[in-house]
């Protein structure tokens, strides 16, 4: 396998929210075709990233109406799972691997991300296991001292896989939890915590910086990058600009726009 390429770029603003999701899909395809692994870091400015299940909330319009007052903009992602918060204190990390000459089970793929995080932060004990009262709970939630700091999902396209982690690094994690709890309470009313949606308890989650003081997203990027000393570093925008054929990327952007049409419709209905 080729040496890994590490991609990063400045914080995505609201008008660019579709970009990292479209880019991830293109990177997965490219990884499979070129047998090229990638490590992709990205952040959104004040977003709530929704799963498709979130768009089926009984009171979706009421749920979405809770977000603007807190300054967060919803975006529906192109992978499974439930809602997570994204802001300047949250780092999203995608480990993208070719599957052309190797097979990775779902659990094996999750383990690769878990081991990467362990390598980067050897001074703390990080455990896996679902934190049921966190937002977007899953079997491979990452926790320190019983509090969730990160969640992992994955997406497979043809001969590539993206193992995607969101890591709460610093900032107001309690406030993030309240934001998501309010979202589901508005969307479910008296059915809060049922129908496959989590009974979010903000105290079930914490920041990495709560255990490693002064930790920042920039420091996390340095630590994770140090695991790959021979990596080539690129700006994601430069990588996109050098694509000979941008039609795949444009197609993925269009798919994201279509997926998010439901958000636009709900907003229009509320006017």
Residue ranges and their predicted role:
Residues 1-101:
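N-terminal lobe of the biotin/lipoate ligase/transferase fold
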Residues 128-149:
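Beta-rich nucleic-acid/ligand-interaction surfaces
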Residues 74, 123-133, 231-235:
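Short, well-structured beta-strand/strand-turn elements
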Residues 146-154, 162:
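Aromatic/basic-lined ligand-recognition segments
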Residues 19, 23, 59, 105-113, ...:
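Short amphipathic alpha-helical segments
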Residues 62-66, 70, 116-124, 223-231:
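Generic non-transmembrane alpha-helical segments
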Residues 124, 159-271:
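Long, positively charged amphipathic alpha-helical accessory segments at protein N-termini or as interdomain linkers
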Residues 91-132:
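Contiguous, small/hydrophobic- and glycine-enriched helical/loop subdomains that border
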């Amino acid at each position: 396998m080729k040496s890994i390429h590490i991609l990063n770029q400045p914080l995505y603003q609201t008008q660019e929210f579709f970009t990292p999701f479209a880019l991830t899909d293109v990177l997965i395809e490219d990884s499979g075709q070129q047998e090229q692994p990638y490590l992709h870091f990205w952040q959104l400015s004040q977003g709530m990233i929704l799963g498709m299940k979130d768009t089926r909330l009984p009171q979706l319009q009421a749920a979405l109406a809770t977000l603007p007052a807190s300054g967060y903009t919803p975006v529906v992602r192109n992978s499974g799972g439930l809602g997570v918060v994204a802001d300047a204190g949250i780092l999203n990390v995608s480990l993208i691997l070719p599957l052309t000459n190797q097979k990775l089970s779902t659990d094996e793929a999750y383990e690769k991300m878990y081991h990467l995080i362990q390598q980067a932060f050897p001074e703390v004990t990080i455990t896996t296991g679902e934190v049921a009262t966190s937002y977007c709970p899953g079997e491979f939630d990452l926790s320190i001292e019983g509090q969730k700091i990160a969640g992992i999902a994955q997406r497979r396209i043809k001969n590539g896989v993206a193992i995607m982690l969101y890591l709460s690094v610093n900032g107001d994690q309690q406030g993030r939890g309240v934001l998501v709890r309010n979202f589901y309470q508005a969307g479910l009313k008296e059915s809060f915590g049922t129908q496959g949606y989590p009974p979010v308890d903000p105290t079930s989650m914490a920041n990495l910086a709560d255990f490693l003081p002064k930790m920042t997203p920039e420091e996390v990027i340095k630590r994770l990058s140090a695991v790959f000393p021979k990596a080539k570093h690129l700006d994601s925008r430069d990588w996109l600009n050098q694509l000979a054929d941008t039609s795949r990327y444009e197609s993925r952007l269009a798919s994201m726009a279509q997926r998010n049409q439901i958000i636009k419709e709900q907003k229009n209905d509320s006017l």
